[in-house]
């Protein structure tokens, strides 16, 4: 769904508290192909839910549906479009949608007052700054990890098949192979793979395939020296984080050892300049982004 549509309010479940409130005020919720396994916060509401899907959805974690329409999704939607009369959207609802979207982008995804640029780039800024200048048809793949939750809200997609993420099992190491496939399938569109340092270390060997096939795309390696998705939960519970923290690794040297150009950045200006340069090079390029990983925990809807 295009993120610049006035009806778009954001993605439910990740860094989207205002959306929770809007859903509770709805007359009816219609879900289309919704896989509820990845919804982080339990959804409990008295609002009727109509599910349109090719499978039975009552075995999911979202909430038992009031009415399910099971079958060919596109056929069901075509039928409804042709048989339901045109309705004007409430101006009040449009205003609420805009407020919800703005609150997520400006507040929940905003940089905290404790952030210091000298500590690295705020992770939410990575997606926001790159989105400002890359073409609308840019395709991204988001790996598993804390940054994936950010990608769901901070990266604005405008076209179908331009945002790829592995839900459910969320395998680390997904993004590079997915990005290579996306670029082969859509050679005219810029393609960017986003991966955390943990995910990168799990599949660094795929760099050899990338180099051998010489696929012109960009890899963004988001470095905070931790498995933050798990580490954040350990911190909240007072657990030891030794197993989810690790020392700084020379990622630039690893990438270059495969014969791939690498750019390392620690400031937003460097990130913007480096990404623009990588787009112009039109060849395999990795950008190592040194983050202030503490920002993940400072955001209102922390991971």
Enumerate the language-model features and the residues they cover.
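Conserved thiamine diphosphate
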Residues: 11, 25, 76, 82, ...
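Glycine-rich, acidic loop regions that bind phosphate or pyrophosphate groups
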Residues: 1-97
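Short acidic, glycine/serine/threonine-rich loops at helix termini
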Residues: 1-6, 40-44, 61-64, 80-81, ...
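Thiamine diphosphate
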Residues: 19-20, 25-37, 149-227
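Short beta-alpha connecting loops at secondary-structure transitions
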Residues: 9-15, 59-65, 160-165, 202, ...
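Glycine/aspartate-rich loop-and-adjacent alpha/beta segment that forms the canonical ThDP
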Residues: 40, 268-303
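Short glycine-rich anion-binding loops that position phosphate/pyrophosphate groups of nucleotides
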Residues: 34-37, 55, 145-147, 198, ...
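Active-site diphosphate/adenylate-binding microenvironment
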Residues: 101-177, 182, 188, 300
